[in-house]
């Protein structure tokens, strides 16, 4: 009886070749296709997998779970890798791998396989998730397999093999970039972008219009949160209202994209130590992250916020490096959920030519006291108390300066 392997399958050249290669090695290959919002023809992908040799194909719609359990969870900690990247690819990988493990368990498969390269981050994200959720599963990673590497030294070898085996290859002109698309973002890498001094051509961008070409008209959105989670979006001009999590996020993507929001061009540090240039389009999440952070400004205690902000870079790093299912992540999420208990209210954002600016906010749990904050009203605050406050904090500075200058106390 053949051993079963569940292959994370995209329908592209690499995973199609891997599927056939695994079949030839004697495996019963079950193809698994994850719909996380990419614009693919899933019917055609399923048909291609079956023709290539898969015994069964799972096409799983994970979009809603992606939004509620992954994107919104990352939002609780304002996750941004190296201060800029909103982690669109990294956040999707643990979800994809989790469902792959579930299918393997359901099918009684002994193996899981993926087509991630040996230079990138995704191999780590997939395999750490496999290990965390079912350490008994064996992993086949062809791009780290000496036999596979000896047979396929590059794209030409893959194409020749596909033609030899009758695997359909798209004849349409391929974009000269390596791209990853899901509901949260689309990323563009490789090609001319490998030169960090190269200014991307406008045709790189497929989701967003250039801010220069965006409408010369402000869009006002009112975004509602409960315990840090987005629950409603209202367009204050045309009255459009979205409360379903998936529809809400798709609407923010739509509004952000047509207004040139969410473009990012950066060189980042991959987990394995290689620097990589990525160009990203993340319109909806950019709007959410900005609005959420603004609401925290009136609802979160100062020290709690500052502690959370100290932990946020580590949170983003854990997501980027593939440690979504880890004890340290459980610890951080428990703390973040506690910190978000009063992050409830609404924020109005002005969206205009690539910019997202909070212009109003309200919360029933607001810690903002107009009288205390006023320049004109005392509001129970005794200004003379500030003298002692300053003296206490100045004491160590005075001592440090005296010692520095060589004086004795």
From Swiss-Prot:
GO terms for cellular component: cytoplasm. One of its GO terms (biological process) is urea cycle. Gene3D superfamilies: Argininosuccinate synthetase, chain A, domain 2, HUPs, Single helix bin. It catalyses: L-citrulline + L-aspartate + ATP = 2-(N(omega)-L-arginino)succinate + AMP + diphosphate + H(+). It is found in: Cytoplasm. Keywords: Amino-acid biosynthesis, Arginine biosynthesis, ATP-binding, Cytoplasm, Ligase, Nucleotide-binding. One of its GO terms (molecular function) is ATP binding. L-citrulline binds at residues 85, 121, 125, 178, 187, 268, 280. Pathway: Amino-acid biosynthesis; L-arginine biosynthesis; L-arginine from L-ornithine and carbamoyl phosphate: step 2/3. Homotetramer. Belongs to the argininosuccinate synthase family. Type 1 subfamily. This is Argininosuccinate synthase. It comes from Thermotoga maritima (strain ATCC 43589 / DSM 3109 / JCM 10099 / NBRC 100826 / MSB8).
